[in-house]
C-alpha cells in the first residue's frame, strides 16, 4: 500500500499537469490511508509520513503563497482522515479485512471525538515501539513485535561475530541460523517459511557480511550522486527515504513484488526525472 501510494503520487507529479489535482491527491490519499496503516504496518505508516514531510518541505513556498488553498486542503484532509478512522475502527484488525457486524455498529455510534479517542486508545500499543531501552548490552522495546525483531537482529550480529563471519556472512544456501534457534521458537512463523529477519539492511549484512553491506551502501550512494549530477537536486529522496525506512522495519523487500516495482520505478525515474515542486 505504501509503495503504491508513493509511486502513484510521483507519477501524478510527473504526468498530471493540474497542480490542484496533484496536491489534493497526495494529501487526501494520505488522509485515507494513514488510519489503516497505523494498524497494518508501522513501517509503512512512517514511510507515508516521511513522504508527506519531504513533499511539504519542498513546497513550503507554495503553501505560504496560497493560504486559502492550504486551509481548504488541511480541512478536507482532516475530514477524510476522521471518516477513514470510522472504517478502521469498525474493522477487525488482524491483517485480513473481516467486518464484524457488532464492531461496525459500535464504531458507527461513536461521535467524531469519541472515535478519534478510540483510535488513539487502540494505537497505544503501536506507539510502544518508540519506547526503546538499553540493558546488558542489548536494545529492547516495550512493544512485543518490535522487541521480537530487535532480538533477531541483534542475535544475527552476535552469531556472525561468534562464528567469525562478520566479513563474509552466512551465504545464500541456508536459512539464517538464528531463525531456527531452538531457544527462540516461533521465528520461522506458523507456516515455517519465515526465513528472513524483516529488515532489508540486516538481511544484506547477514548474507554477505560487511563486504556486501558496504557494496550495497556504495551502490545506493552512487545512485544519489548520479541523480545529483544529472538533475542537480535531491528530489529522488521522495522515493528512496520512505522506501528504505519502511524496509528497515518490515518484510517489504523480502517478497517479490515490492523490490521489483521499487527498482524498476527507480530506474525509470533516473532515466526520466520528475519535478517535486508544485508551481505557484
Language model regions located:
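Alpha-helical transmembrane segments of multi-pass inner-membrane proteins
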Residues: 1-62
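Transmembrane alpha-helices of multi-pass inner-membrane enzymes
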Residues: 52, 236-248, 252-280
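A membrane-periplasm/extracellular boundary helix in multi-pass inner-membrane enzymes
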Residues: 38, 59-140, 158-162
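Aromatic-anchored segments of alpha-helical transmembrane domains
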Residues: 30-37, 78-84, 240-249
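Hydrophobic, aromatic-rich transmembrane alpha-helices
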Residues: 3-17, 53, 211-229, 265
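Hydrophobic transmembrane alpha-helices and their immediate junctions
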Residues: 67-69, 180-186, 207-243
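Membrane-interface helix-loop-helix junctions at transmembrane boundaries of multi-pass membrane enzymes
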Residues: 12-27, 60-70, 174, 221-238
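Long extracytoplasmic/lumenal interhelical loops at the membrane interface
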Residues: 138-208
Amino acid at each position: 500500500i505504501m509503495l503504491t501510494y508513493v509511486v502513484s503520487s510521483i507519477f501524478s507529479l510527473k504526468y498530471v499537469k493540474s497542480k490542484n489535482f496533484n496536491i489534493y491527491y497526495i494529501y487526501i490519499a494520505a488522509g485515507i490511508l494513514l488510519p489503516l496503516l497505523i494498524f497494518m504496518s508501522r513501517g509503512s505508516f512512517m514511510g507515508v509520513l516521511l513522504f508527506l514531510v519531504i513533499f511539504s518541505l519542498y513546497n513550503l513556498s507554495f503553501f505560504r503563497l496560497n493560504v486559502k488553498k492550504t486551509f481548504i486542503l488541511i480541512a478536507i484532509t482532516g475530514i477524510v482522515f476522521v471518516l477513514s478512522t470510522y472504517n478502521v475502527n469498525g474493522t477487525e484488525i488482524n491483517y485480513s479485512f473481516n467486518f464484524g457486524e457488532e464492531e461496525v455498529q459500535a464504531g458507527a455510534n461513536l461521535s467524531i471525538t469519541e472515535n478519534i479517542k478510540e483510535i488513539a486508545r487502540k494505537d497505544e500499543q503501536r506507539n510502544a515501539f518508540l519506547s526503546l531501552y538499553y540493558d546488558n548490552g542489548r536494545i529492547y522495546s516495550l512493544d512485543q513485535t518490535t522487541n521480537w525483531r530487535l532480538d533477531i537482529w541483534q542475535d544475527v550480529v552476535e552469531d556472525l561475530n561468534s562464528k567469525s563471519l562478520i566479513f563474509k556472512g552466512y551465504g545464500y544456501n541456508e536459512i539464517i541460523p538464528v531463525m531456527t534457534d531452538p531457544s527462540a521458537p516461533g521465528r520461522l512463523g506458523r507456516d515455517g517459511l519465515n526465513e528472513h529477519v524483516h529488515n532489508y539492511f540486516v538481511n544484506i549484512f547477514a548474507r554477505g557480511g560487511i563486504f556486501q553491506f558496504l557494496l550495497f551502501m556504495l551502490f545506493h550512494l552512487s545512485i544519489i550522486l548520479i541523480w545529483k549530477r544529472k538533475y542537480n537536486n535531491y528530489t529522488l529522496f521522495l522515493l528512496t527515504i520512505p522506501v528504505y525506512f519502511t524496509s528497515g522495519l518490515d518484510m517489504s523487500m523480502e517478497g517479490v513484488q515490492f523490490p521489483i516495482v521499487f527498482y524498476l520505478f527507480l530506474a525509470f525515474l533516473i532515466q526520466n526525472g520528475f519535478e517535486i515542486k508544485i508551481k505557484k
